[in-house]
Amino acid sequence: MKINLEELKFGTELIKRGFAKMQKGGVIMDVTNAEQAAIAEEAGAVAVMALHKVPADIRAAGGVARMADPKKIQEIIDAVTIPVMAKCRIGHIAEARALEALGVDMIDESEVLTPADVFFHIDKRKFVVPFVCGARSLGEAVRRIWEGAAMIRTKGEAGTGNVVEAVKHMRLINRAIFELQKMNEERIYGVAEKYASRYAELASRVREEMGLESVSRNDVVFEEYTLGEIIDGIYEILLEIRELGRLPVVNFAAGGVATPADAALMMQLGADGVFVGSGIFKSSNPPEYAKAIVEAVQHYDEPEVVAEVSKGLGEAMKGLDVFKLSEDERLQTRGL
């Protein structure tokens, strides 16, 4: 008897998460053209992320950062045999649908681009293509997983070449999971209520302005979901995290990884893989940096290998001191 995965309760979710797990232990590299994509594939990247500018250039250019030109994305798809991902703006359903129609293998609903919606992220369960999303905390990660994200990545601080924020976000998530494992069901439900409250912000603001009563569990607050349904869904995810001792989806490091040692550090902190944005193609020797970072991820627990692949690479990308960035300059604050 042939099984139709679409008819199973978690059929498409299994497919999406399965694709994401296939990238585990690998490096996903940002590329802006077919030539860079070929360099990434040659170096051993498990996938490439197609975008119009690397994060460092997006940060420098300012203005509104949008989805890349579909023609450019198609050229990258045609140039490589590895999976091709692409970024859409937070909450921009139309960009995501366009990318899905284009045939990308995964969509990154990314804070690196200018957000399109300040209230909601995309309901990713309504798409066939899997999504990856950034997170600074367990709350952000769980909300994205509830929405259907098949992969989580640290936000870090993209385009800085400074790994400190990625380290912070990984440690915050790991510590929250540690705390969760000590909680009983009642306390976990309280955490779920707190995490779910972000979905009620639009309805709460409108009701307050109109002088109406506050939002209740039975009120629809996001798409067709009531606040109570969201709380219950997040509660189930938290129980799963408590049982597993980790997120139920793969969790990659991203945002500021610039050297082989940076990549190895994030793997040592528990990352399942690494995204490298500006670190490769803003370095003095992109092909060699790409190969070295792949080697460092594969051998993150072998310091002698990390040291060897780091020799003679030339200058890493110029970095920024994230502590000198204003709140408006911090890309990680985008999203909810």
Curated annotation (Swiss-Prot):
One protein family per Pfam: ThiG
A biological process from GO: pyridoxine biosynthetic process
Stored SUPFAM superfamilies: Ribulose-phoshate binding barrel
Keywords, sorted A to Z: Lyase, Pyridoxal phosphate, Schiff base
Claim: Protein biosynthesis is one of the keywords in the record: no
Signal peptide residue numbers: none
Gene3D superfamilies: Aldolase class I
EC number(s) recorded for this UniProt protein: 4.3.3.6
MF (Gene Ontology): pyridoxal 5'-phosphate synthase (glutamine hydrolysing) activity
Highest taxon of source: Archaea
Catalytic activity: aldehydo-D-ribose 5-phosphate + D-glyceraldehyde 3-phosphate + L-glutamine = pyridoxal 5'-phosphate + L-glutamate + phosphate + 3 H2O + H(+)
Pathway annotation: Cofactor biosynthesis; pyridoxal 5'-phosphate biosynthesis
Binding site for D-glyceraldehyde 3-phosphate: 171
Family: Belongs to the PdxS/SNZ family.
Known partners and oligomeric status: In the presence of PdxT, forms a dodecamer of heterodimers.
NCBIfam families to which the protein is assigned, alphabetical: PRK04180.1, pyridoxal 5'-phosphate synthase lyase subunit PdxS
Function: Catalyzes the formation of pyridoxal 5'-phosphate from ribose 5-phosphate (RBP), glyceraldehyde 3-phosphate (G3P) and ammonia. The ammonia is provided by the PdxT subunit. Can also use ribulose 5-phosphate and dihydroxyacetone phosphate as substrates, resulting from enzyme-catalyzed isomerization of RBP and G3P, respectively.
Annotated protein name in UniProt: Pyridoxal 5'-phosphate synthase subunit PdxS
